[in-house]
Amino acid sequence: MVETNARWALKHGVFDEHELEQALDVLTEYDIDDRDPAWWLRGEHAMSMQTVQVLFEGTDGDGPDLELAARVAHLVGGGDAGEDRLRRIAAMTRDDAHAAIDAFDVYYRELGEQMRTGYPNVRAADMDATAERYVHTNALTEILLPSLSRVQVLRTRNETLRRATQLSYAVHLFEAHHGRWPGSLDELSAEYGARMRTDPFTGRDFGYRLTEGGPTIYSLSENGLDDGGVHSFRWGDEITNETESDDHVFWPPQERR
């Protein structure tokens, strides 16, 4: 929301040259993301392990607590699918529980490394493929092992939003200093660094096109291809333009739909 409002303020000419510099300083100063990208996976991992432990802890036989198993099956969906899950969980042994635990351990370790690597080297499809390798280990993993690629996509979009907003301000400062728009991002001052001009989805420069109406700044989004800066409001989630572009335009700011 802050970055969106900042770009609309830029569009309406709210700032003079000095204020542009101050605003850009604030945007870059508070763009600090030094937390481990995978820190929150610990909770997901712990929940899965705890569920397995509770199901099999304290039972007299080799199988799970059937009353708790029924609750788990109900929580993840009722009807015929829930009954089928319950039958499969009820038939599990402690060896099956250990297999599920091993799958969770390996999955969350691999997923954490993928999240730390991030785009452009690890994309949503890669994370989905990792989940697919372990989700069918047994009935418990099918219930408790999630695909979390969507989290990484949204996290990367947020980072893209922050960088593109800073870049929009840097381009406007160039215009204020030189009386013209930069012909390419290479003309921007080195003091801005490479980070704000780098599209997280590609690891390369944001899309930048200059026309008589001014610059267009856009992300190449999930497919990593330059689709000409044709705006897709919902990125790749819902493409409604004729060119099937998933490019997301940040400058000029786009009206909300």
What positions do the PLM features span?
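Short acidic linear motifs
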Residues: 1-257
